[in-house]
Curated annotation (Swiss-Prot):
Keywords, comma-separated and alphabetical: Cytoplasm, Ribosome biogenesis, rRNA processing, S-adenosyl-L-methionine, Transferase
EC numbers, comma separated: 2.5.1.157
Pfam assignment, any one: Fer4_RLI
Domain of life: Archaea
Name of protein: 16S rRNA aminocarboxypropyltransferase
Residues annotated to bind S-adenosyl-L-methionine: 17, 62, 84, 99, 103
Length: 167
């Protein structure tokens, strides 16, 4: 599955996981959205129903700082926008924070959800904390894997209810 990176050059170059994916030939740099655009502001959620699109046209990650990106910037990118369901960062900067994944964690999660588990594990192996991310989210990733959008939304709702203690 092709992975594309749009790099806004707002991250610390030493910590930029998108550039690492490009350097190690796991992703290709692009200036335009292709296929599925991972967008944290999207109302639609990535699911197995998106696999055909991802196989044909790829997945695009916008590599930028969480502190300097707005919804408007994502809206300008053409493609099929999808967000990831609740997952917890395994990276040292945002460890344990829901939804605040690095670019490489977003790629790993996307591949896992789309049932490309071997490729997800292969990419997790290129960073020290890749397996931390997988272990931290193992149960969630397995529950999202191969599921429809509605099924994932229901699982996510249940997880959030457990976290905030609502019935």
């Amino acid at each position: 599955m092709k992975v594309y990176i749009i790099d806004y050059h707002r991250d610390d170059p030493k910590k930029c996981t998108g550039r690492k994916l490009i350097k190690l030939n796991f992703a290709e740099l692009t200036r335009y959205g292709k296929g599925i655009i991972l967008d944290p502001y999207s109302k639609r959620i990535l699911s197995i129903l998106d696999k055909d699109i991802a196989l044909k046209t790829g997945i695009t990650i916008v590599d930028t700082s969480w502190n300097s990106t707005s919804k408007i910037e994502f809206e300008k990118i053409k493609g099929e926008h999808r967000r990831l369901p609740i997952l917890f960062a395994g990276n040292p900067t945002n460890y344990g924070i829901a939804y605040k994944l690095s670019s490489i964690e977003a790629v790993i999660a996307s591949l896992y959800i789309l049932n490309e588990v071997e490729e997800a594990i292969k990419i997790a192996n290129i960073i020290k904390w890749g397996h931390t991310f997988l272990e931290l989210n193992k149960e969630l990733l397995e529950s999202y894997r191969n599921k429809s959008e509605n099924e994932i939304l229901e699982i996510e709702r249940e997880v959030i209810e457990k976290i905030i203690g609502e019935p």
